[in-house]
């Protein structure tokens, strides 16, 4: 109705396109965002939303351009910066996979079969947590979680989370931790690896993360689902003497793991998982999403 009354109403075109996107009517949503931009050329949110749709349509180069335009008009646009960074890292990943294939051919090494890879059973190990690591995470920039579940974010409740570039932090303790975890990841998947995301969560009373996995359209487009994995490293499990002690719940098949301080769990990124926490003290974990290169 708003568009009928005012055809050049950019915000209305953006809002309608957002609804079409949620209904998975992606081509129509794309046209709607383009109309919004036509009537408001500096509309950062519309550029970002257009990039999201093009990402879903597997047109990553176009998405990249629109994330950059969103940042041009809104330099502090966190979501646009994150999505752009992911696409740039995906470009780097594809290059590394190709280089790895060439290297393996030169060495005449037979590719590891899927039967020898980490599959449905999680890989479990442990790493001693340094006190310095625990204290350093509180000093790194983080943001509050959404208070309610299903409000646009997987994580919810009382707590905080970092951005997705934790391993790029310059502190010696983070560098040492990332090196150790990368070696563990290589051991788990029997391959060199590429980290696409690294972050930390601090969960407090009445918090958690909804059922989800870590597959994205890029993985489907490049047939990388069987090469993507997720790691959780428990820095502090918090208060487990409560109704919801932070059990890691894995699905298909269902499995429950109650971690301890220092626990490391690695599983395929295709696998759905969730956790709920209601303890009195902070529950802190580092998360990593990564790919095997062969």
What are these regions (language model features)?
Residues 97-191:
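Non-heme Fe(II)/2-oxoglutarate
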Residues 190-277, 282-285, 289-293:
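Catalytic core of non-heme Fe(II) oxygenases with the double-stranded beta-helix
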């Amino acid at each position: 109705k708003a568009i009928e009354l005012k055809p050049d109403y950019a915000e209305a075109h953006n809002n309608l396109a957002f609804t079409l996107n949620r209904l998975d009517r992606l081509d129509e949503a794309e046209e709607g965002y383009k109309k919004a931009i036509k009537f408001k050329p500096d509309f950062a949110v519309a550029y970002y939303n257009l990039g999201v749709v093009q990402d879903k349509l597997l047109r990553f180069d176009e998405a990249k351009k629109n994330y950059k335009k969103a940042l041009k008009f809104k330099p502090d646009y966190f979501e646009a910066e994150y999505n752009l960074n992911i696409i740039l890292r995906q470009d780097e990943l594809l290059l590394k996979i190709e280089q790895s294939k060439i290297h393996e051919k030169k060495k005449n090494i037979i590719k590891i079969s899927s039967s020898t890879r980490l599959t449905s059973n999680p890989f479990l190990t442990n790493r001693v947590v340094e006190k310095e690591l625990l204290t350093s995470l509180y000093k790194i920039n983080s943001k509050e979680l959404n208070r309610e579940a299903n409000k646009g974010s997987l994580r919810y409740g009382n707590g905080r989370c970092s951005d997705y570039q934790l391993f790029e932090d310059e502190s010696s303790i983070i560098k040492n931790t990332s090196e150790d975890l990368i070696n563990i990841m290589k051991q788990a998947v029997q391959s060199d690896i590429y980290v696409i995301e690294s972050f930390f969560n601090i969960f407090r009373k009445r918090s958690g993360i909804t059922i989800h996995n870590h597959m994205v359209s890029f993985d489907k487009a490049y047939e990388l689902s069987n090469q993507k994995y997720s790691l959780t490293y428990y820095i502090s499990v918090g208060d487990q003497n409560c109704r919801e002690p932070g059990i890691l719940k894995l699905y298909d098949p269902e499995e429950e793991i109650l971690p301890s301080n220092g626990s490391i769990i690695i599983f395929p990124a295709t696998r759905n998982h969730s956790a709920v926490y209601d303890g009195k003290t902070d529950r802190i974990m580092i998360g990593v999403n990564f790919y095997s290169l062969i």
